[in-house]
């Protein structure tokens, strides 16, 4: 029997997930949708030819008997409420980042999930499912280059929307590095610092771009993370682990190589969707399979969402202060100690 999934929020990412579940993945079907724009929800059902009910709000969708699990793909500030309600209904929930807009909100979700005694919440940090990052994780865990000492990484976008702010460089962009690097080295963050290099001529007047974030872990690893969201040339994700005995680097996306007219070239992708489309597929399939086979989710946890929130808060404070700021995490509950995302 297919897992019956309800979708809360039928915007761009909601439609992407509806499409992959309906047309690409196995073991699940969309049986319910809701959106603050009811016309948009109705149109989504028609566009994808879904045999799904349209509900007026998340309360009615979560109470529906034809819903086993939910995807929360609504506006970020609405995530916390929907996730808490899903937990209270005993339903597994996949939530796109952010899990909540504050660390306090994430902790409320953590506490609510722990009351159930089982893992119900998975956060949408899809990079853990990217084949390149999985290879990095395996190499680090196997100490192929010894202990990690430093990490150099970059998150570059060709351009961003006019409403993109300096703070968003951390809370919307760097948050992916914050999660995946913590997962790669399995070491909590100790402190963060933000440095502003010379401003690019391509940056909007209100935006400080690029930015460099220095993160130190409790185990002494130093991470420098470049954020450059107006690089123009493409969407470029880089990650290099410097170990005691060598260096390992995130592989480039596969592409044909061209030798022509005295030049050797390969393509650079221009958007994040193409760069991580396969990771999104594996991520949602894992959500489906874990529920059907184990009755619990196995991807990034609510605690991972909390770590990301506390770290981004510290980065925003560092943006404003210009100083090194502590990452003040609470002690990890025993409930989450045994949960790690399995390499895919």
UniProtKB/Swiss-Prot annotation:
EC class of the enzyme, as a word: oxidoreductase
Pfam families found in the cross-reference section: GFO_IDH_MocA, GFO_IDH_MocA_C
SUPFAM superfamilies (alphabetical): Glyceraldehyde-3-phosphate dehydrogenase-like, C-terminal domain, NAD(P)-binding Rossmann-fold domains
Annotated Gene3D superfamilies: Dihydrodipicolinate Reductase, domain 2, NAD(P)-binding Rossmann-like Domain
InterPro entries referenced in this protein's UniProt entry, alphabetically: Gfo-Idh-MocA_inositol_DH, Gfo/Idh/MocA-like_OxRdtase_C, Gfo/Idh/MocA-like_OxRdtase_N, MI/DCI_dehydrogenase, NAD(P)-bd_dom_sf
Reactions the enzyme catalyzes: myo-inositol + NAD(+) = scyllo-inosose + NADH + H(+); 1D-chiro-inositol + NAD(+) = scyllo-inosine + NADH + H(+)
The organism's place on the tree of life at top rank: Bacteria
GO terms of biological process kind: inositol catabolic process
GO molecular function: inositol 2-dehydrogenase (NAD+) activity; nucleotide binding
This enzyme's EC code(s): 1.1.1.18, 1.1.1.369
Pathway(s) this gene product operates in, as recorded in its UniProt entry: Polyol metabolism; myo-inositol degradation into acetyl-CoA; acetyl-CoA from myo-inositol: step 1/7
Keyword entries, A-Z: NAD, Oxidoreductase
Family per record: Belongs to the Gfo/Idh/MocA family.
Protein task: Involved in the oxidation of myo-inositol (MI) and D-chiro-inositol (DCI) to 2-keto-myo-inositol (2KMI or 2-inosose) and 1-keto-D-chiro-inositol (1KDCI), respectively.
UniProt subunit comment: Homotetramer.
PANTHER family assigned to the protein according to its UniProt record, in alphabetical order: INOSITOL 2-DEHYDROGENASE, PTHR43593
Full protein name: Inositol 2-dehydrogenase/D-chiro-inositol 3-dehydrogenase
Lineage: Bacteria, Bacillati, Bacillota, Bacilli, Bacillales
